[in-house]
């Protein structure tokens, strides 16, 4: 209790994932402070197990040199640990900042490069994740089987793994995802059966979803999400649904900006006079053959897409409808990144 570790150089932990070899481990303690310390060549950086009200601040953390991503440990790992503050850490060549069965934690103003995921929660609730920036990882932020958390003002750039995302929600309910920027990722937002809990809503508002391969990918939708005031710009595909029978019609859309919107604004109120409609054409080739996205923008693919819209071979399916699409980006400054 009340241990303070400040201005330390900590190097050379063991390599056992089973034993959770770490630079610093806290077991059933309270009020630990780890500040302004450097962790190098450690499997796990800081490991909190039933450790509450810790402050992990201003540290430089990297994992074992030469280890590929699955063999690395987490920069910070919280297990059944609550009310902790994890802020202003620089994390690189590590795995995740992860919280398992941990609630009421604040994870903010951390910076990371070349990790696996940025922030990862499992079976956790009531956490605040804000003002973090991560780039070059295999994935972005992952929230799995978690509830009632606020995720705001984060920047996720160039998540380039096979399933690279800005943010992924897996069986996650009651989330507020707002004012984030998802840029140059394989997917900006991935929603997998989220929300899960009946009667809950995920609110996704005022985010910048920019220049991703897919802006929004939906899987097995069963409950409503609300999409409000987001900017979809430069994405190869604005949105897709990969699960027939999903209840995507439950989702609500309003006040979003879509760079492919072709409507007019005769009364100049900044809102399009006709709804933005996004259809899925069964003959749109890369819905079924993702490798064809390599040829996006080519003359042949552009021609096929034009013909599909002009004379589709099958009835298109409506994926989303925004009745009040914006004519200009909601956040023009960020949209020019």
Specify the residue positions occupied by each region the protein language model found.
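Extended, compositionally simple hydrophobic/Ser/Thr-rich segments
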Residues: 54-56, 65-67, 84-86, 95-99, ...
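Extracellular beta-strand/beta-solenoid scaffold signature
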Residues: 17-26, 41-44, 48, 68-79, ...
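Flexible loop residues that form catalytic
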Residues: 13, 51, 64, 94, ...
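Right-handed parallel beta-helix
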Residues: 2-108, 113
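Functionally critical loop-and-helix segments that line ligand-binding/catalytic clefts
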Residues: 160-162, 166, 175, 188-197, ...
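Detector for repetitive beta-architecture
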Residues: 2, 7, 31, 43, ...
């Amino acid at each position: 209790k009340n241990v303070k570790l400040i201005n330390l150089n900590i190097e050379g932990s063991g390599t056992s994932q089973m034993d959770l070899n770490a630079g610093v481990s806290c077991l059933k303690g309270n009020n630990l402070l780890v500040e302004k310390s450097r962790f190098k060549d450690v499997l796990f950086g800081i490991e909190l197990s039933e450790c509450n009200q810790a402050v992990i601040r201003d540290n430089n953390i990297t994992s074992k040199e030469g280890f590929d991503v699955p063999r690395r440990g987490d920069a910070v790992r919280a297990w059944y640990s609550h009310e902790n503050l994890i802020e202003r850490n620089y994390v690189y060549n590590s795995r995740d900042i992860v919280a398992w069965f941990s609630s009421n934690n604040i994870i903010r103003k951390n910076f990371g490069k070349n990790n696996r995921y940025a922030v990862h929660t499992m079976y956790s609730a009531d956490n605040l994740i804000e003002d973090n920036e991560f780039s070059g990882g295999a994935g972005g932020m992952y929230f799995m089987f978690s509830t009632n958390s606020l995720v705001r003002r984060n920047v996720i750039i160039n998540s380039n793994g096979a399933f690279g995302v800005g943010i992924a929600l897996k069986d996650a309910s009651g989330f507020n995802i707002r004012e984030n920027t998802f840029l140059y990722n394989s997917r900006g937002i991935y929603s997998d059966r989220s929300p899960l809990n009946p009667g809950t809503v995920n609110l996704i508002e005022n985010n910048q979803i920019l220049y991703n391969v897919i802006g929004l990918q939906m899987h097995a939708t069963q409950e409503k999400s609300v999409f409000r005031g987001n900017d979809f710009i430069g994405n190869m595909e604005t949105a897709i649904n990969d699960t027939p029978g999903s209840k995507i019609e439950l989702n609500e859309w309003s006040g979003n900006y879509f760079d492919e919107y072709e409507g007019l604004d005769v009364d100049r109120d900044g809102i399009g006079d006709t709804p933005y409609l996004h259809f899925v054409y069964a003959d749109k080739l890369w819905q079924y053959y993702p490798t064809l996205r390599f040829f996006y923008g080519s003359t042949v693919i552009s021609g096929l897409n034009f013909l599909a819209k002009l004379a589709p071979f099958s009835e298109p399916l409506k994926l989303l409808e925004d009745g009040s699409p914006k004519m200009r980006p909601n956040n023009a400054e960020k949209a020019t990144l």
